[in-house]
C-alpha cells in the first residue's frame, strides 16, 4: 500500500486504483434561546462525525463514493439548532442515515466518440443533482434553515450527465420518500408492487463562465417526500445560485448566493428562501457570515415539542413561519492551513426574528414566548482531507470540476 500526494492510497495489487480516505467530527457546545415552550437550552454534542472513502480506477473513469455518518450514535435526539427542521425534527437538526452515500460513477463513457464532451452515469445512494452543496461541506457548523428546500439528500439515484467545456447538464430519477430514521434505506418498491424509485425526478444546469465562478439552476419534482407509503402530494422544487471561490496567495475567499422555492399541493403551500453566505481567510484566521430569510412549514408536533408527526400529510401543516436570521463566525486554524489535517477552534453567533406568515394557527409567541431568536455555538473541529470534497458532486463533476481548494466542515 502506497500513500500518494493529497492523501490518496494506491493499491499495488490493483494497479491504477486509488483510495482517498476523509473524515471529520465536531465537538460542539451550543445555547439556543428560545426553544419550544419558552426558555433557553444548552447542549454539548459531537456532530457531523463522518468517514468517507473516494475510490478511483481506470485512470479516474470509474469513481466510487462511500460515506458513513455516525450521528445516530452521537446525536440520536438531534442537534439543538433554532429554526432548523426536517425528517420529523423541529428546532433540532435530524441525525443523517448511517450509510450517507454509497454510489459508483462512470465518467466519459464514449471516450473520444463525443469529441470534447463527456457522458457520465451515477448509480447508488446519495445526493440528488439539485440545488447547492450540502451544508456539511460548507464553512459554518450551523445548518441553514433552508436545508430541505435547497438540497435533496439520501435517495436512491440514477443520474445521467453530459459535460462539455464550461457546461454540465444532469438529469436524475430517484425515490421521493425521505428517511424516517438513521438505519432506513430508500424505499425502492412497495409491497403492492408500486415503484417508489423513479417516481421523482430532477434536472440541473451548471455553468462555469470564468475561473472560480459557478452558476447553477435546477428543478425537481419529489413525490410524497414526507409520507413513505406515497399518499402525500408532490413537492415541486426550484433552485438558482451563484458561487465564487478562489485562493489568492494570502488566503481564501468564498461567496454563495442562492434562492430556493418549494411548492406543495399545487401551490397551496409555498416556501421560499433567500440566502447569502461568505468566508474570508487570511493566514490562520477566518471570518464567515450567513444572511438567510427562509419560510418553514409549521407541522403538528408530538408530546416532544422538538418532534413532528411522521408519516406526514399536508393537512398536518398548521401554518407557515418566516425566519430571518444572521450568523457571524470567527475561526482559527490550529494545523497548517491547506494541509490534509484540519484542526480548528471556532465561535458562531446567530440572531434574528421569526414571524407568522399566513392565517394558520401557528403562533410564535404562544410556542416560544418571543419572536426574537438567538444562538451561540463554540466548537472544535477535526478532519482529514475534507478540503478536497464537495459532498454530492459525483461523476463528471467530481472528476473534472471538483473544487480542490474547497473547505470541508473541518475548517470551521
How should these model regions be labeled?
Residues 9-109, 373-377:
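Beta-barrel outer-membrane channel/assembly domains of diderm bacteria
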Residues 25-31, 57-61, 68-74, 125-129, ...:
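Transmembrane beta-strands of outer-membrane beta-barrel pores
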Residues 28-39, 77-103, 109-206, 313-317:
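Surface-exposed coil loops of outer-membrane beta-barrel proteins
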Residues 43-49, 95-100, 152-158, 163-165, ...:
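Residues that define the transmembrane beta-barrel architecture of outer-membrane proteins
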Residues 49-57, 102-106, 158-164, 171, ...:
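Residues on the lipid-exposed face of transmembrane beta-strands in outer-membrane beta-barrel proteins
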Residues 60-64, 111-114, 119-121, 129, ...:
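Repeated loop/turn-to-beta-strand initiation elements of outer-membrane beta-barrel proteins
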Residues 164-168, 172, 204-320, 324-326:
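Detector for outer-membrane/organellar transmembrane beta-barrel domains
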Residues 368-412:
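Outer-membrane beta-barrel "beta-signal"
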Amino acid at each position: 500500500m502506497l500513500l500518494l500526494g493529497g492523501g490518496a492510497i494506491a493499491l499495488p495489487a490493483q494497479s491504477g486504483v486509488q483510495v482517498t480516505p476523509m473524515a471529520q467530527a465536531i465537538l460542539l457546545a451550543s445555547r439556543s434561546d428560545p426553544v419550544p415552550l419558552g426558555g433557553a437550552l444548552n447542549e454539548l454534542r459531537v456532530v457531523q462525525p463522518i468517514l468517507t472513502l473516494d475510490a478511483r480506477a481506470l485512470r479516474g473513469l470509474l469513481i466510487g463514493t462511500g460515506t458513513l455518518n455516525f450521528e445516530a450514535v452521537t446525536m440520536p435526539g438531534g442537534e439543538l439548532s433554532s429554526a432548523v427542521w426536517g425528517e420529523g425534527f423541529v428546532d433540532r437538526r435530524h441525525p443523517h442515515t448511517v450509510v450517507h452515500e454509497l454510489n459508483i460513477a462512470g465518467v466519459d463513457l464514449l471516450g473520444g466518440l463525443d469529441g470534447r464532451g463527456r457522458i457520465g452515469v451515477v448509480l447508488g445512494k446519495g445526493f440528488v443533482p439539485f440545488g447547492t452543496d450540502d451544508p456539511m461541506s460548507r464553512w459554518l457548523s450551523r445548518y441553514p434553515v433552508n436545508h430541505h428546500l435547497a438540497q435533496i439528500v439520501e435517495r436512491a439515484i440514477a443520474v445521467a450527465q453530459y459535460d462539455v467545456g464550461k457546461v454540465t447538464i444532469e438529469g436524475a430519477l430517484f425515490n421521493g420518500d425521505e428517511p424516517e430514521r438513521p438505519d432506513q434505506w430508500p424505499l425502492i418498491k412497495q409491497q403492492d408492487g408500486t415503484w417508489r424509485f423513479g417516481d421523482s425526478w430532477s434536472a440541473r444546469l451548471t455553468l462555469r463562465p470564468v475561473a472560480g465562478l459557478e452558476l447553477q439552476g435546477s428543478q425537481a419534482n419529489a413525490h410524497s417526500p414526507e409520507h413513505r407509503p406515497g399518499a402525500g402530494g408532490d413537492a415541486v422544487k426550484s433552485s438558482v445560485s451563484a458561487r465564487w471561490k478562489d485562493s489568492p496567495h494570502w488566503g481564501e475567499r468564498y461567496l454563495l448566493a442562492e434562492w430556493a422555492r418549494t411548492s406543495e399541493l399545487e401551490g397551496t403551500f409555498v416556501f421560499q428562501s433567500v440566502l447569502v453566505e461568505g468566508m474570508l481567510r487570511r493566514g490562520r484566521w477566518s471570518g464567515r457570515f450567513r444572511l438567510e430569510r427562509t419560510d418553514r412549514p409549521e407541522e403538528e408536533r408530538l408530546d416532544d415539542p422538538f418532534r413532528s408527526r411522521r408519516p406526514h400529510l399536508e393537512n398536518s401543516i398548521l401554518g407557515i413561519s418566516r425566519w430571518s436570521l444572521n450568523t457571524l463566525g470567527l475561526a482559527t486554524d490550529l494545523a497548517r492551513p491547506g494541509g490534509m489535517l484540519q484542526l480548528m477552534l471556532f465561535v458562531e453567533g446567530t440572531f434574528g426574528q421569526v414571524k407568522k406568515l399566513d392565517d394558520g394557527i401557528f403562533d410564535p409567541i404562544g410556542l416560544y414566548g418571543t419572536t426574537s431568536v438567538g444562538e451561540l455555538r463554540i466548537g472544535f473541529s477535526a478532519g482529514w482531507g475534507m478540503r478536497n470534497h464537495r459532498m454530492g458532486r459525483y461523476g463528471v463533476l467530481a472528476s473534472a470540476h471538483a473544487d480542490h481548494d474547497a473547505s470541508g466542515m473541518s475548517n470551521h
